[in-house]
Amino acid sequence: MATPVKKWLLRVAPWFLPVGIVAVWQLASSVGWLSTRILPSPEGVVTAFWTLSASGELWQHLAISSWRALIGFSIGGSLGLILGLISGLSRWGERLLDTSIQMLRNVPHLALIPLVILWFGIDESAKIFLVALGTLFPIYINTWHGIRNIDRGLVEMARSYGLSGIPLFIHVILPGALPSIMVGVRFALGLMWLTLIVAETISANSGIGYLAMNAREFLQTDVVVVAIILYALLGKLADVSAQLLERLWLRWNPAYHLKKATV
């Protein structure tokens, strides 16, 4: 059994490396090894963050980016889940859908930005479309994979007990595929922010990406670093949220009990 000290160390261990990097960064800036034209000091970044926060500009851009990300993820994730269920549950569905989806998946969706701008302009629908497209494929693939890798013995046993159709799907197939689906959700959440960063830096007049590009034009490297750190923190927050959902929805899974016990 882990001692309180060991538990505390395990909790703070993920922060050792980031804190060490910031400490070295501050030291290099203080002694003049690192020019502020190349990279501002942590103190300068904190000052820029405070200034943007106090003016309300940062929170306005953050709210807009978060709204775009959530709407795009909801649309793309829902479509990916539905299409994955169709392909996973039906051989005919797989024959009709999978080849086309795999072809689209191999087209870099960020390469579609010029076409998307022509179709939608630079309004919200362009960013939401790109985020939805980026998040669709990880959830589709992992949903299909989860369904196709369910233990056939469990399915046959459930059928022998009289389960079929919707009850079989709810009680056996969906729980069996859920771990794989959640992996797809975590990948999709990472791609959600990655896609939005590029979309906002190319075709936007608001959002965190726009804030960074606007700061670049005026050589405000401290604001650029603030935007980068914000994206990193938002990505981490999304990943932690997905982990919490895994623990909530998969608390019946012995693998998660084992993981908790080892910690």
Located regions from the model:
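Transmembrane-helix boundary motif in ABC transporter permease subunits
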Residues: 71-101
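Periplasmic/extracellular loop-to-transmembrane helix junction in inner-membrane transport proteins
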Residues: 3-4, 31-74
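C-terminal transmembrane helix and the adjacent membrane-cytosol boundary/short C-terminal tail
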Residues: 91, 148, 179, 183, ...
